[in-house]
């Protein structure tokens, strides 16, 4: 199958008017909104780096933002399992954590892919390392079909002997009842897929978080929170993202779990155990 050409912008007027017909013919208004939401900055960085898609793109993006990655137990990345394996991670940032994950694993295994929400699939320079699914698939047969294709693609990736990354929460972290930023329950669909894959699992924890304003918007509406995501990316300019790499969990250990809820809790706990690392 012929690959779709890389689009130089992430989101522009033509995309918006197709999504929301109300904006058709209102190019100046759309461009104003794109600037207000920092999408114009995202478009610039994408255009600046999209000629080197995939893993090199992640390095260029992080370099343009002057973001440093501080990695605990980095030697574990140099001793990843041969053949197929899975990474599981918390999802506090919604975009930069996926980009950082692809950089640190993809530099060792260039064919590494990460399952992401359809929103991130607009970053066309990242599609070589993305498998996109739709979080709202249950409400729309067409979206459900896209997500099923994504699940099949993930299974084929592992069967081909390549690594696969998951953010099992399926959405960016949010405020819990104890006023901590935390993933929601890791999704049974992803946990079932991990169990079916029967390969080692590497937990990876991201210590960063988005702004309190982003968190508040998530309480009001996930759509408002999504609109804020580009600005959150640029809020991390000149920052350090702290990442911890956990010990590889053997496939045999995963096989011991018959209950998906218990397996999900176990994998999440193994990931969040690294929260205390400073």
Predicted regions and their residues:
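Membrane-anchoring hydrophobic helices of lipid-metabolizing enzymes
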Residues: 1-88, 98-100, 107-111, 127-128
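Non-catalytic C-terminal accessory region of glycerolipid acyltransferases
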Residues: 2, 8-11, 147-278
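A conditional alpha-helix N-cap/helix-loop micro-motif detector
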Residues: 51, 67-68, 143-148, 183-184
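Short His-Asn-centered micro-motif
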Residues: 88-91, 115-117, 167-169
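Short, basic, glycine/proline-bearing loop/turn elements
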Residues: 88-90, 132-141, 174-177
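Short amphipathic alpha-helical face segments that pack within enzyme cores
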Residues: 96-103, 189-192
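Glycine-rich, phosphate-binding/catalytic loops in enzymes
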Residues: 103-106, 182-184
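Conserved nucleotide-cofactor-binding alpha/beta core module
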Residues: 111-152
